[in-house]
Design a protein with these regions (language model features):
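Short, hydrophobic alpha-helical packing/hinge segments within bilobed ligand-binding/sensory domains
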Residues: 1, 18, 148-151, 167, ...
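Extracytoplasmic ligand-binding site segments that recognize negatively charged/polar headgroups
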Residues: 8, 12-153
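A ligand-binding cleft/hinge motif common to bilobed small-molecule-binding domains
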Residues: 17-22, 153, 159-176
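Paired acidic/hydrophobic, glycine-rich loop segments that form the ligand-binding mouth/hinge
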Residues: 8-12, 141, 158-163, 179
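Periplasmic binding protein-like
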Residues: 1-9
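Periplasmic-binding protein-like
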Residues: 125-134, 173-197
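Extended ligand-binding regions for polar small-molecule ligands
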Residues: 196-206
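Short, charged, surface-exposed secondary-structure boundary motifs
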Residues: 1, 38-46, 188-193
């Protein structure tokens, strides 16, 4: 955003990026009086911490979900309720992980780190070590949901982290993908609308 000039009025960052935009000064506070629908959001999303600074709201969430742990139930029998699945030797070469920061957070949870969004240098080093340990097991780091769907359809992978769409598409096509609910917990995400600095004066922004 810093180097792109004033070519847009709004930007939609995920929750782990939104505060960086606020701190960088490239977005401005949102006038919630001009967004009446914001008051009808679930309470947890009306003034979330990652969009709050100096008593002001800096964005409005519009979607949310979880990063799922998914396995092909026809090929993975009795999977553990754990994030350990992608690190299991039993699935060497049959694992796919998202090429995204969320995989770093997932790995940190698996490593037992309490606050995966604010790691110390030592915790980050531990997470890196665990990630590298699992790298030889990974068939491919997926980038898009369509890419991951293809990997499952072709039988190239049997376990991954995934978006909700991967499960939905699999069920629609009759494939037996199931979600694991890990004891270590899962990652959640939100996308929000923020207002580029100076764009609030444009009535079309709201």
């Amino acid at each position: 955003m810093v180097g792109s000039g004033s070519i847009f009025d709004q930007v939609s960052p995920p929750n782990d990026i939104a505060r960086r935009l606020v701190d960088a000064g490239v977005v401005e506070p949102v006038d919630l009086a001009k967004v009446p629908a914001a008051s009808r959001l679930f309470p947890v999303f009306q003034r979330p911490a990652w969009l709050e600074k100096d008593g002001k709201a800096w964005g409005v969430p519009y979607s949310f979900g979880m990063v799922r742990i998914v396995v092909d139930a026809d090929k993975v029998k009795n999977p553990p309720r754990s994030l350990s699945v992608p690190w299991s030797e039993a699935y060497r070469g049959k694992v796919s992980l998202w090429d995204d920061m969320e995989t770093l957070y997932m790995t940190a949870r698996y490593a037992g780190i309490a606050n995966v969004y604010d790691m110390t240098d030592a915790e980050l080093a531990t997470t890196k070590e665990v990630l590298l340990k699992g790298k030889p097991l990974v068939k491919k780091y997926w980038f898009s949901a369509g890419e991951l769907d293809t990997l499952y359809t072709s039988g190239e992978v049997v376990a991954s982290n995934a978006w909700e769409t991967t499960l939905v598409n699999a069920w629609k096509s009759g494939r037996n993908l199931v979600e694991i609910v890990p004891t270590e917990s899962r990652g959640g995400w939100t996308d929000s609308w923020t207002v580029a600095k100076g764009a609030g004066k444009n009535p079309c922004t709201y």
